[in-house]
């Protein structure tokens, strides 16, 4: 508000660029998320910008008028761009925008100058770094969430060893992914998409239960058959907000209401968790509380790593090849 007040006398058009998304259904106004991660609708409602450019959700919004502010959001991965034009009419600017593909042609420069570097990177990505006792095929999102994921078990094992924590949680990208043997750096970076570092949080049993309840809300029973809840699919696909745990034994009962589905929680060997507090290793992304895990924000941080997970995973595979898959979780889901 202060920025708008300060600059208003000098601006014909005010534009806010925000690394955020839309927390409400832009057609109905229904609240979709209150995590604080997405606040574009609040900005449009409470601040008097002419244009609001967002880019967090990877959700296409070609152009929409919200509370007198023109808002837009391009899709992910630079496949398209938004061309926004304004026309001054009757003392104000009216906007329209079009979504335009970037096309397949490029200029000769800097392409030619950068090509040797690109070639070297591609060769490095394809160098073998180790082997698995068996390749991991691409894992269906629902099946992995219901029955467990070998890929997630591998990532959690890396996190446990690197951090020394008692428990660990990790997530996977939106697309079904596996890991072939021999393993290459390309394979690792495709399997673990994010440049996350590690954080160890001090958590209680109550916090662990809240986190697992959030995971259990991923499922929706339709005629007694588990499906993926639309809250993880709309307004954008968020499979990466379902977490896989290690060091624990837990059971979800999907017949129970969301928020009361965790009916068993113990250590991996079945013994009680104990008094606590406990050390939970997670990503720096999840530690901020994003994705519906707001309670993590209040947890004390015991340790922060500075090496990204793809590099840690490659280091682990190199040091322990051939990789035998750990059994680091007991997960049971009832429906």
Where are these predicted regions, by residue range?
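Binuclear metal-dependent hydrolase catalytic cores centered on His/Asp/Glu-rich metal-binding motifs
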Residues: 1-14, 96, 105-108
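Active-site-proximal segments of metal-dependent phosphoesterases and phosphodiesterases across multiple
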Residues: 6-51, 146
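Divalent metal-coordination and catalytic microenvironments
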Residues: 15, 52, 56, 86, ...
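Active-site-proximal beta-strand/loop segments in catalytic clefts of secreted hydrolases
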Residues: 17-21, 55-57, 74-76, 171-173, ...
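Hydrophobic alpha-helical scaffolding
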Residues: 28-33, 107, 111, 141-149, ...
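Active-site-adjacent helix-turn-beta-strand microarchitecture at beta-sheet edges
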Residues: 35-128, 216-220
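Glycine-rich phosphate/diphosphate-binding loops and the adjacent beta-loop-alpha structural elements
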Residues: 127-150
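Feature captures C-terminal
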Residues: 154-157, 162-166, 171-335
């Amino acid at each position: 508000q202060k920025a708008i007040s300060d600059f208003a006398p000098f601006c014909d058009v005010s534009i806010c660029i925000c690394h955020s998304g839309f927390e409400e259904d832009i057609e109905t106004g229904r609240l979709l998320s209150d995590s604080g991660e997405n606040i574009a609708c609040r900005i449009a409602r409470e601040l008097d910008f002419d244009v609001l450019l967002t880019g967090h959700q990877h959700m296409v919004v070609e152009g929409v008028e919200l509370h007198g502010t023109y808002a837009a959001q391009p899709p992910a991965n630079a496949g398209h761009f938004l061309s926004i034009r304004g026309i001054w009419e009757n003392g104000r600017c009216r906007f329209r925008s079009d979504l335009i593909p970037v096309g397949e042609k490029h200029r000769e420069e800097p392409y030619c100058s950068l090509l040797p570097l690109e070639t070297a990177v591609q060769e490095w990505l394809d160098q073998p770094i180790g082997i698995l006792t068996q390749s991991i095929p691409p894992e269906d999102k629902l099946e992995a969430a219901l029955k467990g994921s070998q890929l997630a078990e591998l990532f959690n094992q890396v996190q446990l060893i690197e951090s020394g924590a008692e428990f660990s949680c990790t997530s996977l990208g939106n697309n079904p992914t596996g890991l072939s043997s021999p393993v290459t750096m390309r394979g690792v970076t495709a399997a673990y998409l994010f440049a996350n570092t590690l954080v160890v949080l001090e958590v209680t049993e109550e916090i662990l239960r809240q986190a697992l309840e959030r995971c259990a809300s991923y499922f929706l029973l339709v005629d007694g058959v588990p499906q993926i809840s639309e809250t993880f699919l709309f307004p954008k696909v968020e499979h990466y907000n379902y977490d896989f745990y290690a060091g624990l034994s837990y059971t979800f009962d999907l017949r129970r209401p969301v928020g009361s589905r965790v009916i068993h929680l113990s250590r991996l060997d079945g013994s009680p968790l104990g008094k606590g507090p406990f050390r939970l290793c997670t990503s720096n992304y999840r530690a901020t509380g994003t994705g519906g895990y707001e309670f993590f924000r209040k947890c004390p941080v015991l340790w922060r790593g500075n090496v990204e997970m793809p590099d840690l995973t490659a280091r682990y595979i190199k040091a322990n090849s051939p990789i035998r898959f750990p059994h680091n979780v007991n997960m049971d889901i009832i429906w």
